[in-house]
Amino acid sequence: MRRIWAWLSFSLCASLLVIATARAAQSGRLIFLSTQLRLIEEAQKMRNLILDGYRREVDYVTALPQQFPVRIKAEEQSGTHTIDVVGALHGELQPLVRLDALAPLDDFGGKLTGRGIPGPLMTFGKLVTAHQLYIPWMQASYIMVANKAALPYLPDGADINALSYDQLAAWAGTIQQKTGKRLLGFPAGPQGLMHRFFEGFLYPSYTGGVVVPFRSEAAEAMWTQFASMWKSVNPNSTTYVFMQQPLLSGDVWIGFDHVARVLDALRQKPNQFVAFPAAAGPKGRGYMPVLAGLAVLKGAPDMNGAMALIDYLTQAQTQLVTARNVGFFPVVKTELPPDFEPGLKLAAAAIANTQSAKDALAALPPIGLGQHGREFDKVFMDTFERIVLHGQNPRTVLDREAQTLNRLMSETGAPCWQPDPPSNGACQAQ
């Protein structure tokens, strides 16, 4: 019965989405379908503040990620096109390549080169093809935040914007030695995002990949070192969900989390904290970009109007309005104005410093797993719990968990994603 109700609810939402876009198309306005900024308050800000400065009326229609490809496929199959521009996360746009639904934007993308969108972000927009299929729109990421009280304990000669994991461990160890407290923190609670730390930061930094080198010797050494560093981590980290709370309370002096989950601390006490990139390992400074892009569908009713809207949304002034109002940060190169909120400035600078780092190594969120994403995350969290929290032998755990990982990847058929090398067929741990 639950499945039936879920199917009916999904079908109703999809039908309402079709009706909304059809009515909007009849009005002659541009149709902008987005999986992002869906909450009522966010959507209102999009319509009334961000799109308000555009010269033409735009109907901003939102869709849940699971509805998004269904709607696009329905238009492709019917031959009736109503949508001009789509906005979605990188991983939500990737499946549209198989549908051959996205119009190439090579010439248009070339005209935007002067805006300073980082090369790696534009490369993501090719979706592993030869063509520019989306233009980066807005971004978030994961950053580190430290209480300024921790700064005197930094290792000699350490640059906070270019820390290594060895230096991070030494920093936390010195704080513990001098204060008697374990003040490094991670969001390892039940609803925390600790799995993203492993998938996007630690594994790429030490192994250069995620799935392929999952059980490698480099991974074994990585887990051994991380288990050692955990001795300086606040034990309450296994309950933390949003790191802004322990940062504000002083229970943690150094923390890692998604920018949205530390932003409140930066906004409340911008003079008390510093924000900076995650650390680097032997293979580079692994980081996981949260990137939303703008694309045009093949058969869009107004191709020129669609590109004009994308042009507007990627202008520096529009990007700043977006950052002020919805907390997504610019993808273009722009100077933050003097009156920009201090907490947002700290976060934006940390993201910019991450991307511009000479050793930056982007690791995309998992792609192609469908509804099995949580099972993928569980492999990394189970590995963490067994090795770090329970002290089990790293080699034994990695060999066992690699079997689970390979079985999952085979079942989903998901090919490798960056930074793992491209694969023919399902990605596999070697």
Segments and roles (model prediction):
Residues S228, N234, R267-V331, L364-P365:
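Extracytoplasmic/periplasmic substrate-recognition and gating elements
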Residues I31, N48-I117, P152-L154, W253-I254:
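Extracytoplasmic "Venus flytrap"/periplasmic binding protein-like
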Residues D106-I117, I160-N161, Y203-M222, S228, ...:
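Short, solvent-exposed loop/beta-turn-alpha elements that line the ligand-binding surface or hinge
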Residues L37-D59, F380, L398:
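Short, polar/charged alpha-helical segment
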Residues A169-I175, G209-Y240:
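Glycine-centered hinge/linker elements that transmit conformational signals in sensory
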Residues L89-I143, A169, V274-F276:
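Hinge/lid segment of periplasmic solute-binding proteins
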Residues R324-R386, A414-Q430:
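Long, aromatic- and glycine/proline-rich binding clefts that accommodate carbohydrate-like moieties
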Residues G125, T129-M138, Y142, D166-V211, ...:
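Extracytoplasmic/periplasmic solute-binding protein
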